[in-house]
């Protein structure tokens, strides 16, 4: 899974890139091909049927060359509509996914589960992921990991628990795209955010608004490198995350 950090790409002995690529729809040289898929008429029609909304905004995308060993999670912890629960995502198979490649999975019915999170779990990703890992240990037999073929798309709700199975054979790639869509009538945020995120820039493609990648994720500089490293470090340590949140509240007064 993308770490939101600036990293050098690591290539496996089989020639696959280990890291996922974040916001591939806003990548130079790659964006046009990806946007043709993610904003296609077929996708827009499917989104309308699933949500009942006429228009949707593309908020985030990722490309996977290899199984990135994504842990069990719910999207609404990281990005969602406000009010929560209306964002949805799609997993696009770019090749036939072999069962030993580490298939994508969902936990059917998990969108109805409302986990009570303590303060550490609300602000620190590591605590939240640990909670879901323990939950999945008791529900591993309930997961659904379909044998997706090239061109297949699996959509799920922002509350649905999902992730990827372990890779059994590293000789197999798992080329795929993931995209997150927000009905355009809703504001953008995440589950434990009190106010929507308003400083968002969009561009238009095929009648769909697409969120532009944040500059600190799009343009490399020492400043942006340090900024993302510090943020990710705090995000994995509850005490630091609490201190940071307290300082932000004091500054906002």
Where are these regions (language model features)?
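Non-heme Fe(II)-dependent double-stranded beta-helix
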Residues: 1-81, 119
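A short beta-loop-beta micro-motif enriched in histidine and acidic residues
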Residues: 42, 75-87, 141-142, 148, ...
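Short edge-strand/loop segments of extracellular domains
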Residues: 66, 107-114, 174, 180-186
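Glycine-rich, charged/polar anion/phosphate-binding loops
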Residues: 74-77, 91-92, 140-142, 161-164
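Short, structured patches in soluble enzyme cores that scaffold and shape functional sites
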Residues: 62, 74-76, 92-96, 108
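Double-stranded beta-helix
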Residues: 97-161
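Short, conserved beta-strand element in jelly-roll/cupin
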Residues: 81-99, 147-150, 155, 180-185
């Amino acid at each position: 899974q993308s770490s939101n950090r600036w990293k050098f790409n690591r290539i496996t002995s089989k020639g696959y890139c280990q890291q996922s690529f974040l916001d591939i729809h806003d990548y130079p040289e790659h964006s046009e091909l990806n946007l043709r898929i993610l904003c296609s008429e077929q996708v827009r029609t499917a989104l309308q049927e699933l949500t009942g909304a006429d228009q949707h905004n593309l908020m985030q995308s990722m490309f996977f060359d290899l199984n990135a060993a994504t842990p069990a999670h719910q999207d609404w912890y990281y990005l969602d509509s406000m009010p929560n629960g209306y964002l949805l995502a799609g997993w696009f198979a770019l090749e036939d996914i072999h069962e030993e490649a580490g298939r994508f999975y969902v936990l059917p019915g998990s969108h109805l589960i409302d986990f009570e999170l303590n303060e550490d779990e609300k602000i620190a990703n590591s605590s939240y992921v640990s909670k879901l890992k323990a939950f999945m240990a008791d529900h591993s037999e309930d997961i659904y990991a379909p044998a997706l073929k090239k061109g297949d798309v699996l959509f799920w709700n922002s509350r649905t628990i999902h992730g990827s199975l372990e890779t059994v054979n590293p000789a197999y790639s798992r080329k795929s795209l993931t995209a997150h869509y927000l009905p355009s009538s809703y504001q953008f945020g995440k589950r434990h955010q009190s106010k929507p995120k308003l400083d968002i820039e969009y561009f238009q493609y095929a009648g769909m608004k697409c969120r532009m990648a944040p500059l600190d994720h799009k343009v490399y500089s020492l400043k942006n490198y340090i900024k993302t490293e510090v943020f990710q470090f705090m995000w994995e340590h509850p005490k630091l995350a609490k201190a940071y949140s307290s300082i932000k509240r004091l500054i906002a007064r």
